[in-house]
Every structure is written in structure tokens, then in C-alpha cells.
Design a protein with these regions (language model features):
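C-terminal motif of bacterial Sec signal peptides marking the signal peptidase cleavage site
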Residues: 15-18
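Bacterial signal peptide processing site
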Residues: 20-22
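A short, amphipathic beta-strand motif
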Residues: 28-36
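Beta-strand-rich extracellular modules
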Residues: 35, 94-96
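Short, ordered, surface-exposed loop/turn motifs in non-cytosolic proteins
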Residues: 37-64
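Short, surface-exposed beta-strand/beta-hairpin micro-motifs centered on an aromatic residue
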Residues: 76-83
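A short tyrosine-centered beta-strand micro-motif
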Residues: 87-93
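Structured interaction patches on ligand/partner-binding surfaces of diverse proteins
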Residues: 96-127
């Protein structure tokens, strides 16, 4: 009987550890493109929350990582979050749209379904 319990608890521990989802340790990348009415927002701060499908808050401490959206060659401003696992993520961005002289912000839920690859995501922002 004792051996069966040891085997059961060992299996349970291995199953729990191997089911890790969301966060870092994988081979996925999210390329987040912050945009306000289709206009790219360079230098916007782009935040990511692992395991979230809704906005967790608007403070930097509510998120797991942050990057600055940069213009790379002729591409629109974007930020890369690399090394992600399959799972749910929430991307939130804050920046300044010089065409309307306003601070803009917004976010979007992202689901990664594959083991590896890059997912381009437009982050819609409003005043």
C-alpha cells in the first residue's frame, strides 16, 4: 500500500510541474505594435502580464515585464517579448500620440497556442 502512495504522489508532483503554462521558458515571441487610430506610437511603454485575459491594473507593478516600443528600420514601432510558453497573456501600452497631442493607452488579450513562433499583435490605444 505504501509503495502505491509513493508512486501516486510522485506522479502527481511530476504532472503538476510539467503542466506549466504562461510565462517565460518557451520558444514563442509576441511582437506588440502599439497603435492609435492606425498611427504607430514610438517610445510607448508596452507591458505584459502572464496568465491574464483581462487588464490586471494600470500600474507597472501589476505586470510581469515591460519594454519600450522602438522603430526598427522601416517597420512600425514595436516591442518584442521573447521566450514565452503557450498560454494567455495581456498586453497593455501607454504612450504619447504627437498627432493629437494626447496620452493614449490600451490593451489586448493574446493567446499563444503553438510551442514556438512569433505572433504579431496590434495593441489598440485610445485617449
Amino acid at each position: 500500500m505504501k509503495i502505491k502512495l509513493v508512486i501516486f504522489y510522485t506522479f502527481l508532483a511530476v504532472a503538476t510541474i510539467s503542466c506549466k503554462k504562461n510565462g517565460t521558458g518557451g520558444e514563442n515571441t509576441i511582437a506588440a505594435f502599439p497603435k492609435h487610430h492606425g498611427v504607430s506610437i514610438p517610445n510607448a511603454t508596452v507591458y505584459i502580464k502572464y496568465g491574464a485575459t483581462e487588464l490586471p491594473g494600470q500600474n507597472a507593478s501589476d505586470f510581469d515585464d515591460a519594454k519600450t516600443a522602438v522603430v526598427d528600420g522601416s517597420s512600425a514601432a514595436h516591442a518584442h517579448f521573447e521566450g514565452l510558453l503557450k498560454g494567455d497573456y495581456y498586453i497593455y501600452s501607454v504612450g504619447f500620440d504627437s498627432t493629437v497631442n494626447e496620452v493614449v493607452s490600451g490593451g489586448i488579450a493574446v493567446k499563444i497556442k503553438s510551442k514556438s513562433g512569433e505572433q504579431d499583435v496590434e495593441v489598440p490605444m485610445t485617449e
